[in-house]
Amino acid sequence: AEEMDALGGQINAYTTKEYTCYHTRVLDKHIDRALDVMSDMLLHPLIAQEEVQKERNVITEEIYMYDDAPEELVHDALQDAIWRDTSLGMPILGTEETIAAFDADFIRAYYERNYHQENIVLSVAGNFEEKEMLGKLNEKLGGWKRETPFVQHDTHAAYQISCVEKEKDIEQVHVCLAFPGLTREHPQKYALAIFNTLFGGGMSSRLFQKIREENGLTYSIYSYTTAFADTGVFTICASMNPNQTERVFELIAEELKEVTAEAFPEQLIAVTKEQMISNFIIGTESTLNRIGRVNGSSGLGETGYDPATNTLSYLCNITGDADSLDF
């Protein structure tokens, strides 16, 4: 951290349900030093018991904070219900019990099994020469070899119909309704994204306007999509006074019936497409977003990196007819 601070750079990491990403951002003139730091972390991690204990305490506190946020906890409860007994159903932070069971030997064994030359995606975005960058990466990581072959685990998670309730002494009720969604490579994923934006993805969406603005029944209401390699989910979430729960469910059901029976107007779809295209193009200006797109496709069993031009083409070709929005 001190070395990156001295360069005026940033270094961080995040974990999703399917992968962990370590990333850094520096001026192009500091790339050699940044690669030194990143490769040293990857090849020679400090996995000492005293460091594990420190981090265990930090993560345990994060779990306590998360448990105090029911608007967040409800999403974990939902995913546990629909993907029970699979990795997708497990919270990213873990539980107090699983964190307490880890020690340095356990983490080191995990590192040896999974941090493997056959199980890594390297992505770079910014101002660089490709041939020169490949040479630098090969210099830092080309000699990295594990003697044991990498074993890819079957991560298939079938959607399960279920219902789960968790009681807390709070003023509100937080509800999530989930429906089978689309995988990351499904050809209709962009159509679903447009549907989500129109149905519950913003303050101008049908759900927000009907239930929050017109009837004033919820504190918040929205929908979102989640896509993984072999499964997906479409989720509707709402927060409300317990007395309003039944009426909110009724209105959500009415809105679902209406959008099933009648297509969205072409003009509304056109406006939504332009909004999504603009947001996408602006997002590509971020180097972190660019490397995230590479990591999220190349490393997760997809057929390859989906260029931005393909995404824009798919969005532009979506219309309001039944075939275009058939998912």
State where each predicted segment sits.
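Flexible, small-/acidic-enriched active-site or ligand-binding loops
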Residues: 162
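Short glycine-/small-residue-rich flexible loop motifs, especially phosphate/cofactor-binding loops
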Residues: 1, 208-209
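A conserved active-site cap/scaffold subdomain adjacent to cofactor or substrate pockets
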Residues: 170, 181-185, 190-201, 207
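Catalytic cores of enzymes that engage adenine nucleotides and/or redox cofactors via long glycine-rich
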Residues: 158-159, 210
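Residue-level marker for well-ordered alpha-helical positions
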Residues: 205-206, 246
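Charge-rich, well-structured scaffold segments of protease-associated domains
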Residues: 2-156, 165, 176, 182-183, ...
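Short linear Ser/Thr-Pro motifs
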Residues: 204-205, 286
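Short Ser/Thr-interspersed hydrophobic loop/turn segments at strand-loop and sheet-helix junctions
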Residues: 5, 203-204
